């Protein structure tokens, strides 16, 4: 699959045969200007605040410079739990309406799945034999509403034959939340309390990585098959966009595909 440029973070897992997973960094060869500099891949609807033409150009450059096997299946993410199954390759590079979903799965070689984030947790799932992949946008709302479990269930591979990579997200020493987030997890599962540490009355730091590991293991993955974590989008402004840190922020992409 070749060597990737410095503005790409390749998944730190034992890659399944033919599977590639990576996240882009903000300092890639994009055309966006501050505060979206440089490689902002955020929604062309303008949700991220960047000029749509800049996002379009950045997406085109991404495909060309990474030599992707096809145009990525961009999603309209809404912090929901809808899982899109991709059964065909895109027929052209023409812009199409992005389907509303927060996860996607495929077994089609050459189909590029993509998730956009800027603090939420991107998760890549793959069959250990390389036959199937999935990507998930797992913010706290999605995690609480079982988006990971739903994506595992949407895959045709048995959970014990899956592995996962947890991409860059807001870290457990920087992501402070209130009672609403704490209650969304702990009221349903007291074991989730270990992913929260008190900062001040009514506020906690939350460990999205720990919550995701709990959810994935509950869905049937083994602990040793879950990789990644340890990064923090909030505290690393040189590499990552962060909505929590900057408010007006771009989005980076986490992509996965099965080689043709």
Curated annotation (Swiss-Prot):
Keywords: Copper, Hydrolase, Metal-binding, Oxidoreductase, Transferase, Zinc. Its cofactor is Cu(2+); Zn(2+). It catalyses: adenosine + phosphate = alpha-D-ribose 1-phosphate + adenine; S-methyl-5'-thioadenosine + phosphate = 5-(methylsulfanyl)-alpha-D-ribose 1-phosphate + adenine; inosine + phosphate = alpha-D-ribose 1-phosphate + hypoxanthine; adenosine + H2O + H(+) = inosine + NH4(+). InterPro entries: Cu_polyphenol_OxRdtase (IPR003730), Cu_polyphenol_OxRdtase_sf (IPR038371), Cytotoxic_necrot_fac-like_cat (IPR011324). Signal peptide: none annotated. Gene3D superfamilies: CNF1/YfiH-like putative cysteine hydrolases. Its EC number is 2.4.2.1, 3.5.4.4, 2.4.2.28. Pfam families: Cu-oxidase_4. GO terms for molecular function: adenosine deaminase activity; copper ion binding; oxidoreductase activity; S-methyl-5-thioadenosine phosphorylase activity. Zn(2+) binds at residues 79, 120, 137. NCBIfam families: peptidoglycan editing factor PgeF. Purine nucleoside enzyme that catalyzes the phosphorolysis of adenosine and inosine nucleosides, yielding D-ribose 1-phosphate and the respective free bases, adenine and hypoxanthine. Also catalyzes the phosphorolysis of S-methyl-5'-thioadenosine into adenine and S-methyl-5-thio-alpha-D-ribose 1-phosphate. Also has adenosine deaminase activity. Belongs to the purine nucleoside phosphorylase YfiH/LACC1 family. PANTHER family: PURINE NUCLEOSIDE PHOSPHORYLASE LACC1, UNCHARACTERIZED PROTEIN YFIH. Homodimer. This is Purine nucleoside phosphorylase PD_1754.
